[in-house]
Design a protein with these regions (language model features):
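Catalytic cores of carbohydrate-active enzymes across secretory and cytosolic contexts
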Residues: 1-142
Length: 142
């Protein structure tokens, strides 16, 4: 899901986002009482919470409880360079046997490294917090 501001209430609301990976992974996270670490699609201020899903939401991420979601925040330009530059411009063609379509950019690579460093930091922090509150917290799947 991504977050969108409701124009009437000015509160964040969850909106479904497309993606096969999310569709496949979300039910596993939910059934395993896991933690979802991801980009919410917007910048959240310190202390702003992820809202619960709408009770009528039937999308795969609807069952992710807000206290099990860890948002990762990025500068929009860095995220765009990471996602559209490195992931879609470089990795996607390479992983789909189209190396002639791959585009290589040092800036996109730097953005990719910065985004992954932030994801790693949030993941380690979440695992450390989980180990403090639940000594039998299982095995992390990344």
């Amino acid at each position: 899901f991504v977050l969108k501001k409701n124009e009437l209430t000015l509160k964040w609301e969850r909106k479904a986002s497309a993606g096969g990976l999310v569709t496949a992974v979300a039910p596993v996270v939910i059934q395993g009482n896991g933690i979802w670490i991801g980009w919410a699609g917007v910048h959240l201020e310190e202390g702003e919470k992820i809202p619960e899903s709408d009770p009528n939401d039937k999308t795969p991420t609807a069952g992710l409880l807000s206290d099990r979601v860890i948002p990762v925040d990025f500068d929009p330009q860095i995220f765009d360079s990471y996602y559209n530059g490195c992931c879609n411009g470089t990795f996607w063609p390479l992983f789909h046997s189209m190396p002639d379509r791959a585009q290589f950019s040092a800036d996109s690579w730097k953005s990719y490294c910065a985004v992954n460093k932030e994801f790693a930091s949030k993941t380690v922090g979440a695992l450390e917090n989980l180990s403090r509150v639940d000594t039998d917290s299982g095995t992390p799947l990344v």
